[in-house]
Amino acid sequence: MAAEGPLTGRLALVSGASRGLGRATAVELAAAGAYVVCTARSTRTGATQTDVDDLTLEGTLDAVRAAGGDGEWHRCDHTEPDQVEALLRGVLDRHGRVDVLVNNAWGGHDHHEEADGEEVWDEPMEQFRAMLLGGAYSDYVTTLLTLRLAMGPARSGLVLTTTWHTPEPPAWVPYESSKAAKNRLVYALGYHLQDKGIGVVAVAPGWMRTELMEAHVAPEVLAGKTESPHLAGRVMAALAADPEVMRWTGQVVDVGELADHYEIDDLDGTRPHGNAGRYRPSPVPPPLPGEGG
């Protein structure tokens, strides 16, 4: 039996759900009662990351069920409109609704190339294109098709996008620019959907202890500077359950700010802002190659 909670009876679709923030979000939404449709490109017969065991959709669904929730998984490349439309039509045929969309797909680091030199103009041209496709474009495709087929006709729903607050001064040019495109898309969609009862919110976590980060970064580097991806997942579950979620629409909101607002702690009881023993994640580097979020 699925978990009972504030999202019972709701269906959430989470892209990029095979690992990291996507997996944690699927688990937290399911723990709050939602039926979760998990999508990504990585399966046990074709994993895109092998540095850590079972970073796959099947592994995510196992974690969802271990948390007392339920759902299903489907392999989908969210840069391909035909695949996304087929996915959504199948979900609607089986369940009749999509209440929450979490845009977490991110493929740009799969094409990571080191610059040949140290100057900004030495950056490979392909890098920015790959990040735009894996980030803002996949968000655009998935959101518009979800609006067209499900949320628009229902005049209800919530679109959540995982992103990054680009720093000042800016760092890695293709990464910062592609994240800025994601953020502006949220602002533009929020503006155009504000009178239709559909919220669009970007959620910006800090430096997360994902599976790949813990496998590649020394524990002493992570200590005191990081949060688990479950903190952002819990925040997104709270947003999905909030009847006044439209207060955040069109905005990029820091996970720490939302955790304070909803009084949510991380798995270890910490929170990015607030009382003694809590931390503020800084500085934050770009994700590891192949990492989502």
What is each of the regions a protein language model found here?
Residues V102, L160, V200-V203, M213:
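Hydrophobic structural elements of the Rossmann-like NAD(P)H-binding subdomain
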Residues L29, R97, N183, L193-M208, ...:
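Conserved Rossmann-fold SDR core element
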Residues T48-D53, D116, D195, P205-E227, ...:
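A glycine/serine/threonine-rich, flexible loop-to-helix segment
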Residues M1-H95, G107-E119, E126, G290:
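Short-chain dehydrogenase/reductase
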Residues A202, P219-G293:
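C-terminal helical subdomain
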Residues R10, G69-D70, R97-V98, A150-T163, ...:
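Active-site loop of short-chain dehydrogenase/reductase
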Residues G107-H111, E119-M131, D139-Y140, R148, ...:
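Catalytic loop of short-chain dehydrogenase/reductase
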